[in-house]
Amino acid sequence: MASVYENSYMIVLIFLLLGILLPVVALTLGRMLRPNKPSAAKATTYESGIEPFHDANIRFHARYYIFALLFVIFDVETLFLYPWAVAYDNLGLFALIEMLIFVVMLLVGLAYAWKKKVLQWL
């Protein structure tokens, strides 16, 4: 019985190694085989074929990052909720309570951000 588990983990390990090794090999080969002829035209920013008329380095307001982080947090929450919702019939009351605690913790964080006026734009 132990060999079945070891075989399963070996398959995961092989996929993990291939998932790391293949991109590294592809990027290394691409770097070695590409022509390296730097020029001033290649260093400029591309703006739909038009000559760039201002600097490409634009500063974003910090609030964009806060909204992006909040989006990522609640997006990951839905990733955790989906498998639970699919297998809800088999999990029982304990899993329901665990998921409610998880959702309440996220809602408390959202209420805290709302109270600190992080979600107000100006």
From Swiss-Prot:
Keyword tags: Cell membrane, Membrane, NAD, Quinone, Translocase, Transmembrane, Transmembrane helix, Transport
Subcellular location: Cell membrane
Catalytic activity: a quinone + NADH + 5 H(+)(in) = a quinol + NAD(+) + 4 H(+)(out)
InterPro entries hit by this protein: NAD(P)H_OxRDtase_bac/plastid (IPR023043), NADH_UbQ/plastoQ_OxRdtase_su3 (IPR000440), NDAH_ubi_oxred_su3_sf (IPR038430)
Superkingdom, natural source: Bacteria
Species of provenance: Bacillus anthracis
GO CC annotation terms, alphabetical: NADH dehydrogenase complex; plasma membrane
EC code: 7.1.1.-
Gene name of this polypeptide: nuoA
Assembly, per entry: NDH-1 is composed of 14 different subunits. Subunits NuoA, H, J, K, L, M, N constitute the membrane sector of the complex.
Name assigned to this protein: NADH-quinone oxidoreductase subunit A
